[in-house]
Amino acid sequence: MTRVRRGYIARRRRTKIRLFASTFRGAHSRLTRTTTQQKMRALVSTHRDRGRRKRDFRHLWITRINAVTRENRVSYSYSRLIHDLYKRQLLLNRKIPAQIAISNRNCLYTISNEIIK
């Protein structure tokens, strides 16, 4: 039986996986089987944490807005501010007021005072 020369397909696949896992530590970047497992695990974590990142940022923005609004007036809270925004039909997402709260608190104070009136 004659010798069959293998193609480059399998080597190309393994090289692609190795390049992906080149920053992993130890055997996770050297051995093909563990590299493949770690690549799948990394992709699963990335997919899961994409949704988690959205939740975390929303939580952070809400906390920032709430802190600034409570600092201004004791009776005024985050939920009341958002409720008044919706009543006035000012459709702002949580990110914009949070940035305003950090960069320019007086601006957020004026917005909240105008909404109350």
UniProtKB/Swiss-Prot annotation:
Protein family per UniProt: Belongs to the bacterial ribosomal protein bL20 family.
Keywords: Chloroplast, Plastid, Ribonucleoprotein, Ribosomal protein, RNA-binding, rRNA-binding
Keyword Membrane on entry: no
Function: Binds directly to 23S ribosomal RNA and is necessary for the in vitro assembly process of the 50S ribosomal subunit. It is not involved in the protein synthesizing functions of that subunit.
Subcellular location per the Swiss-Prot or TrEMBL entry: Plastid, Chloroplast
Transmembrane segments: none
Pfam families cross-referenced by the UniProt entry: Ribosomal_L20
Coiled coil ranges: none
Biological process annotations from GO: ribosomal large subunit assembly; translation
GO cellular component labels: chloroplast; ribonucleoprotein complex; ribosome
Name recorded for this polypeptide: Large ribosomal subunit protein bL20c
GO molecular function: rRNA binding; structural constituent of ribosome
Species for this entry: Liriodendron tulipifera
InterPro entries in UniProt: Ribosomal_bL20, RIBOSOMAL_L20_CS, Ribosomal_protein_bL20_C
